[in-house]
Every structure is written in structure tokens, then in C-alpha cells.
Swiss-Prot record:
PANTHER family noted in UniProt: PHOSPHOMETHYLPYRIMIDINE SYNTHASE, CHLOROPLASTIC, THIAMINE BIOSYNTHESIS PROTEIN THIC
Source organism of the structure: Escherichia coli O81 (strain ED1a)
Protein name stated in the entry: Phosphomethylpyrimidine synthase
Function: Catalyzes the synthesis of the hydroxymethylpyrimidine phosphate (HMP-P) moiety of thiamine from aminoimidazole ribotide (AIR) in a radical S-adenosyl-L-methionine (SAM)-dependent reaction.
GO terms, molecular function: 4 iron, 4 sulfur cluster binding; carbon-carbon lyase activity; zinc ion binding
Keyword set, alphabetical order: 4Fe-4S, Iron, Iron-sulfur, Lyase, Metal-binding, S-adenosyl-L-methionine, Thiamine biosynthesis, Zinc
Gene Ontology terms: biological process: thiamine biosynthetic process; thiamine diphosphate biosynthetic process
Cofactor: [4Fe-4S] cluster
A Pfam family matched in the record: ThiC_Rad_SAM
A GO-annotated cellular component: cytosol
EC class (word): lyase
NCBIfam families, alphabetized: PRK09284.1, PRK13352.1, thiC
Listed pathway(s): Cofactor biosynthesis; thiamine diphosphate biosynthesis
Family to which this protein belongs: Belongs to the ThiC family.
Length: 631
């Protein structure tokens, strides 16, 4: 918890200073590397952690060292992780994918925006001070064309995005030569198909089958391609967004950059306050990762927060507005059907999803079927024209342990499976959202039900939280469930911060949530047996056994916290080379004792070997030279 609570003015000033002074930067003793592909412009960024050599012998005056290989790791920070790139938030990021989009020849620039709301915002001079200056001219598919990665995959095309992803998912492990580092335990994948080497062809085939998605709106060319699917690395989403009572554009951009630095694979902008449109433009133009939204939130703002006043026309206009800004995936609560709402009446906590409750209220007040369900094909037509992926929302997810795995939850899930098939008719990419609050023994059923009824479309879950008794620590309660469901096959985990159920997260809360979920995702990758997942663990264990403290800090998910905890008790520079830590001290360090045992055993082996040779020499009569047949 922060020691001093800042005022709103101080928070905004701090965020503005962060933006004004933002520079590309690497983690301690890391450097940015790029691995090139065959398609023009495919340069895949990774972070390479530099390690110190291991002392293997020699004398104090002339020590002998053995080099340790640098460890390449997946990097979501985009240009913000490259010290060589000049960052200017006012101008936005470079449009990495623009040449690839243009080369396909199936899009056209729009001379007029499709959304009436966008037109009104652009015409409002009073918003000039808030507006992002370099507004993108949006594109859409030419008439008769679909521009989704699923469409290309089904046609057998390997796009530059697919090659980029294949290189990225392999995490540079082909650069690692050490057998010690490459050693990996077999995983238990629960039916997932994890190849030894991820190729662009494999990426294409998984997308074509609907088992994976590449969220990549043609109007978000700044994003670096990534993939969500159970046969790939488990991904983590971070939520940001302003509300009616707190946060500003500056703070949301700061949270975006902060999120990508700490490992967010995607970011959802859940803004519900003022200037949603302008905030989103700033976020998209500065985001190297896909951005998702829940369009019903903004649609509700347009009708002054009155759910009953929502209409398909308002919602459709919102979809067009956001698609032309560059939103990469929409959460759509189209599975909350009128007949399912009564199923929640006996729940302890009712309907806890904001989107789900909005649609349930609309259905009941009009006594009509959910207009998102009724107009789902039109939603798909819009998504196909911009390559917006659909994240089919779990509006009836359980909000408490008692309500887990109930009739309403699974009824909605089955409907999401039906909608998945409809979306695929339009070549629209789909993932399925999941719970929620589920005790550990009931988690796996969620994965098996999703795979069966949603046709192996990627699963994307909020946790799940495994107990309800720990407000303030729900990043832990949910991290447990997240690791489990990630192992069972969940493709992306939506982070939970310490502020869950309590308030809007700040910058530090975002970091805590992300670190917790990166741990959960990595633990799931290890358990699944994702190729190369264990390399970093092996490097850490080797550094730990050899008391290479600096390397231990730098290999950590959070080097700064690891160093700070160590230095609380051993702050002197000598503590960075000591063969012990403050937990056990020099006389009781198990690893130091293990090293001594290993050295002793090696010496004993030599002595025993020499004794055996001596006895053998005497048994042969002590002759220096033996006849050939005796040798």
C-alpha cells in the first residue's frame, strides 16, 4: 500500500510528468534484440537478459570462469522497451503493420466516418485540447472482401502477422545451446497439441481451425501481432479505464504503458466516465498490444446511463465508432437471453457482470429478447469489415463460490457456442469468456464444458477466484484458479488486482495484478509442457545455486522487488557476492552445504579411483609394462 495518498491534482500531474519524460528503457542488465523473418518488416522484439560468468576454479589472482548464455524472453513492452527508440506520446507509435495491411489490397480509406457519434465529437471544437492530434484516417474492407486473419488462414495464406507470431512464440530458444538450460520436464497438456517448434504454418492452421485468434484490427497498425490459443503461451490481459469518479486521460495512458512494461499481452479499456472516445484514441495510438473494449458501457453512457433506453441503433453506431478507431476485440454479452434471467433468481449474488446486468435489465423492461442476440449477424458483418475479434461475454458468470457452475452459467455458455459457429460463417475470430468465482474442485469442468460446447474456441477467464474471504488479496485467490485453468487449457487470463471488489486500481495495483498473473500463466505453461518454458527457471536455479545474486535479480519477473528484499538485510555490496542470504546465514545455507558435499564427493571419487588403481597395480605384480595380452 502507498504511504501517502495523492490528491486528484497530484495524480494527474504525476501522470503528465510520466508521459512528458517517457523514454524507451530496458530492465536491469537486459537488452532489446530483434529476430527477423522472411516477410519484409518482420522484426520480432525480445528482451535478452545478460548473465555473469560462473566461477569454476583457478586462484584468487587468476580465477577461471565459464560464460553463461543470455536468456531471451517474450517482451510485450513494444517500443517502450527499446532504449534506442525516441518516444513521443503526442505523436503515437510507429505503424508497424501498415505496409502489410496496404500490401493485401483489400481495404480502402474512408472519406467520411461511419459513426454519427464520431462525427459529432470531431466537430466539437471544445474537445480540441483533449483530442489526440494525429487522428488516423480509418480503413475498412473493400466491398465484397473480408479482412480477418481467420479469412486469410482459411484461404491458406500465411500473413506477416502469422510469421511474426511463430517467431515470438518460440521465444528465441533456438539460441540456447546449454543442455542444462534446455532440460524440461514432460507436461500434461489435457489434449492440447503443443509442437516442438512453432511454425507460421502451425499458426495459420490453428487460426483456421478457430482454436486461436490474432486480435489485429486494420485500424490499429501500431500493435505487434500476438496470438491467443491453448496451443500457445498462456496470455494475460490487464484492465484499465476511467470512471465517473476518478482517473484522467493522462493516467490511463500511463497505466497502458505501465501494463505493457509489466507483461500485459492485451489491455482492455473499460472506461465509463467522461471523454471515453478521446481517452480510447490516445490509448490506441500509443498501444503496442491489442486493445479490447465492452461497447455496451459506452452505449449506456450515450443514453445517460438508463439501460431501458438502449437501442440497437445506438449500439451499432458505437461498434462502428470503436472499430474505426482501431479496437481489436469487443466483449459482447449476446448470450444473456431473456429465458435465462429467471435462472439467476435463487443465486446468492445474482448477476455480477456489468454488461450482463445491463442486458438483463433491458430484456426484462422490454420483455424482449436480447437485441445483441437478435442482431448478432449484423455485429459479425461489422467485425469482418475491420477484423475486430469477438470476445463472447459471460454475462451470467458466478459472482460467488456458492453460485459456481450453476444452470444459468452453463446455459449461457451453450448459447455462446451457437454464436461462435455463426461468427465463423463470417470469418470473424472468436474467443469465449469464462468465470468468475469457482472453487478448485469445480474448475476443470469449466474448461471441458467450454471445449465441448464452444468447439475449442479460445477460453478467456477472469481468474477464477477460488475463495471469497480475502478482499484486498484477490489477486492471490484468483491467481490460484488462473494457474489451474491455464494448465487445463485456458488461453488467456484476465488479471485481478488487489483492489478487486474494493475500488479502481492505481498504477501499483496494476503491477501487482500483472506479476501475479504472469506467475500463473508461466506456471501453466510449465505444466502444459510448452516448449522452452523451463529455460528461464533453469537459468534462475543455476544462478541461485552459484550465488550469482545479480543474475537472480535480473532473471526475476520483478527485478526491483527481488533486489529490494535482498538489500533490506544485506545492503552492502559484499552481500551481492556472499555465498548465503539472511534467511539461513553463512553456516546454515543449504546450497552452500550442497556445494561442499558435491566437492567432497568429487574428491572422494578421485581418491577411491586412485586406490582401486593402486590395488590393481599391485595385483598384477607391480610391473610397469605388461605384455599386450595381459593389458
Amino acid at each position: 500500500m502507498s504511504a501517502t495518498k495523492l490528491t486528484r491534482r497530484e495524480q494527474r500531474a504525476q501522470a503528465q510528468h510520466f508521459i512528458d519524460t517517457l523514454e524507451g528503457s530496458a530492465f536491469p542488465n537486459s537488452k532489446r534484440i530483434y529476430i527477423t523473418g522472411t516477410h519484409p518488416g518482420v522484426r520480432v522484439p525480445m528482451r535478452e537478459i545478460q548473465l555473469s560468468p560462473t566461477l569454476i576454479g583457478g586462484s584468487k589472482e587468476q580465477p577461471q570462469y565459464e560464460e553463461n548464455e543470455a536468456i531471451p524472453v517474450y517482451d510485450t513492452s513494444g517500443p517502450y522497451g527499446d532504449p534506442q527508440i525516441a518516444i513521443n506520446v503526442q505523436q503515437g507509435l510507429a505503424k508497424l503493420r501498415q505496409p502489410w495491411i496496404d500490401a493485401r489490397g483489400d481495404t480502402e480509406e474512408l472519406t467520411v466516418r461511419s459513426s454519427d457519434y464520431t462525427k459529432a465529437r470531431l466537430a466539437d471544437d471544445g474537445l480540441d485540447e483533449l483530442r489526440f492530434s494525429g487522428v488516423l484516417t480509418p480503413k475498412r474492407a473493400k466491398a465484397g472482401h473480408r479482412v480477418t486473419q481467420l479469412h486469410y488462414a482459411r484461404k491458406g495464406i500465411i500473413t506477416p502477422e502469422m510469421e511474426f507470431i511463430a517467431i515470438r512464440e518460440n521465444m528465441g530458444r533456438e539460441r540456447i545451446r546449454s543442455e542444462v538450460l534446455r532440460h524440461q520436464h514432460p507436461g500434461m497438456s489435457f489434449g492440447a497439441r503443443l509442437p516442438e517448434n512453432i511454425t507460421a504454418e502451425f499458426v495459420r492452421d490453428e487460426v483456421a481451425a478457430g482454436r486461436a485468434i490474432i486480435p489485429a484490427n486494420i485500424n490499429h497498425p501500431e500493435s505487434e501481432p500476438m496470438i491467443i490459443g491453448r496451443n500457445f503461451l498462456v496470455k494475460v490481459n490487464a484492465n484499465i479505464g476511467n470512471s465517473a469518479v476518478t482517473s484522467s486521460i493522462e493516467e490511463e495512458v500511463e497505466k497502458l504503458v505501465w501494463s505493457t512494461r509489466w507483461g500485459a499481452d492485451t489491455v482492455m479499456d473499460l472506461s465509463t466516465g467522461r471523454y471515453i472516445h478521446e481517452t480510447r484514441e490516445w490509448i490506441l495510438r500509443n498501444s503496442p498490444v491489442p486493445i479490447g473494449t465492452v461497447p455496451i458501457y459506452q452505449a449506456l453512457e450515450k443514453v445517460n446511463g438508463i439501460a431501458e433506453d438502449l437501442t440497437w441503433e445506438v449500439f451499432r453506431d458505437t461498434l462502428l465508432e470503436q472499430a474505426e478507431q482501431g479496437v481489436d476485440y469487443f466483449t459482447i454479452h449476446a448470450g444473456v437471453l431473456l429465458r435465462y434471467v429467471p435462472m439467476t433468481a435463487k443465486r446468492l449474488t445474482g448477476i455480477v457482470s456489468r454488461g450482463g446486468s445491463i442486458m438483463a435489465k433491458w430484456c426484462l423492461s422490454h420483455h424482449q429478447e436480447n437485441f445483441l442476440y437478435q442482431h448478432f449477424r449484423e455485429i459479425c458483418e461489422i467485425c469482418a469489415a475491420y477484423d475486430v475479434s469477438l470476445s463472447l461475454g459471460d454475462g451470467l458468470r458466478p459472482g460467488s463460490i456458492q453460485d459456481a457452475n450453476d444452470e444459468a452459467q452453463f446455459a449461457e455458455l451453450h448459447t455462446l457456442g451457437e454464436l461462435t459457429k455463426i461468427a465463423w460463417e463470417y470469418d470473424v475470430q472468436v474467443m469465449i469468456e469464462g468465470p468468475g468465482h469457482v472453487p478448485m474442485q469445480m474448475i476443470r469442468r469449466n474448461m471441458t464444458e467450454e471445449l465441448e460446447h464452444c468447439h475449442e474456441a479460445p477460453f478467456y477467464t477472469l481468474g477464477p477466484l477460488t475463495t471469497d474471504i480475502a478482499p484486498g488479496y484477490d489477486h492471490f485467490t484468483s491467481g490460484i484458479g488462473a494457474a489451474m485453468i491455464g494448465w487445463f487449457g485456458c488461453a488467456m487470463l484476465c488479471y485481478v488486482t488487489p483492489k478487486e471488489h474494493l475500488g479502481l486500481p492505481n498504477k501499483e495495483d496494476v503491477k501487482q495484478g500483472l506479476i501475479t498473473y504472469k506467475i500463473a500463466a508461466h506456471a501453466a505453461d510449465l505444466a502444459k509442457g510448452h516448449p522452452g518454458a523451463q529455460i528461464r527457471d533453469n537459468a534462475m536455479s543455476k544462478a541461485r545455486f552459484e550465488f550469482r545474486w545479480e543474475d537472480q535479480f535480473n532473471l526475476a519477473l520483478d527485478p526491483f522487488t527481488a533486489r529490494a528484499y535482498h538489500d533490506e538485510t544485506l545492503s552492502q555490496e559484499s552481500g551481492k557476492v556472499a555465498h548465503f542470504c539472511s534467511m539461513c546465514g553463512p553456516k546454515f545455507c543449504s546450497m552452500k552445504i550442497s556445494q561442499e558435499v558435491r566437492d567432497y564427493a568429487a574428491a572422494q571419487t578421485i581418491e577411491v579411483g586412485m586406490a582401486d588403481m593402486s590395488e590393481n597395480f599391485r595385483a598384477r605384480g607391480g610391473e610397469i609394462y605388461l605384455r599386450k595380452e595381459e593389458a
